[in-house]
Amino acid sequence: MEELKLLGNRASPFSYRVLWALKHKGVKYEYVEEDLFNMSELLLRCNPIHKQIPVLVHAGKPLPESIIILEYIEDTWPQNPLLPLDPHERTMARFWIKFGEDKAPIFYKFFHTVGEEQVKGTKEAEELLKTIEEYGLGDQEFFGGEELGLTDIAYGWIACWLDVLAEAAGVEMLGPQSFPRLQAWAERFKQLPLIKDNLPDRHKMLTFFKSRREKIIAPAATT
């Protein structure tokens, strides 16, 4: 079997995207935990451009960026497909994945700001959630229909990380009254054995992100 390594971090939703996809495919791999603030020589050598995790190393060849890695996994290991066979449905899945990636910075604005800027950032994130709920998910069980797909994995951080980020920032996000369908999807997603058995400890995540936020907003608090 060709060597397969995943360089990631247990606090990173992007690392978990890759981890979930590999486990869904039943592919064996070696996981290498990376320190986000003291990156290894291996990581810097494998991803010299962005110097970020995750990186998948397959047969000595590194691949950066979680969404690109997901596409590679789908192409390389066709068993248990995560993308639809229908060309239109397949393309729309890719559309919503790209949409989420393009808009991702909006979700982090409320976490990185305070005061009026945080209020504004929270509203912008809620508007984006409405768009995803109405036009991306709709009335489906999952983004691709009745079964887990690549779009669900790409948006999995909303189900498993967004509430942690919101609590760390002292705001409310993804409430069942405001987003009933998206909240229901998030609960279904988290209850899947694949996801449920492969999640970081929530308390540790909350502690980590509270610490990160304090460091991020510290300059704003002193001006």
Summary of predicted features, one role per range:
Residues 129, 177-193:
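Short, mixed-charge aromatic SLiMs
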